[in-house]
Amino acid sequence: MRFLSTFALLVTAIAVASTATPASAQVIDSTYRVDAKDLYVMMFRADWCPPCKVVEPRLDRALQTLRDPRIEYVEIDISSPGASEIAAHAAFDREVVPQYNRWLGLTGFAAIVDATTKRTLGCVNVLYDAASMTSHIRTLKQQALRDEQTVDFTCPEAHNPG
């Protein structure tokens, strides 16, 4: 009998522990996400885009320098219909469809988007070297976390106004 009650207590403890939400998790619609993000870096690119060949390696170095798990790289690739479909799903899943629609068809830049408010904070393009990208992204993230308004003129005009 003692074994049975100890076993029941152990099973109950395991069940309770397995349903606990981690302290670092973000509760969303009664589920939790351990991988909650602060920023999305949306790279608008295509295989045939000459500026992309400059921007992408610099952006990769900048993100490697930052090593921030709360910054997510989101590729908006329009190289082919299949790539475009994947990009549309990525934008939809992250609720950044307005940015996707605004710049669909333009390439060679990355938009920095607040993952919480979905506000575009700024952009990086071929005029930025890797160190400047790192600094700009870090600054935009700090401003987003403090909920400060940003004024950034580095983003291109809308390709698809609406």
Role assignments for model-derived ranges:
Residues 104-146:
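Non-catalytic, surface beta->alpha helical segment in thiol-disulfide oxidoreductase systems
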Residues 7-18:
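Bacterial N-terminal signal peptides
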Residues 53-67:
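Typically the conserved alpha-helix immediately C-terminal to a functionally engaged Cys/Sec
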Residues 85-116:
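Short, internal strand/loop/helix patches
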Residues 25-26, 132-162:
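Non-globular targeting/processing and membrane-anchoring segments
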Residues 68-90:
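Thiol-based oxidoreductase modules, predominantly thioredoxin-like and allied folds used
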Residues 35-49:
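Short active-site neighborhood of thiol/selenol oxidoreductases, capturing the structured segment around
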Residues 23-39:
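A short beta-strand-turn-helix
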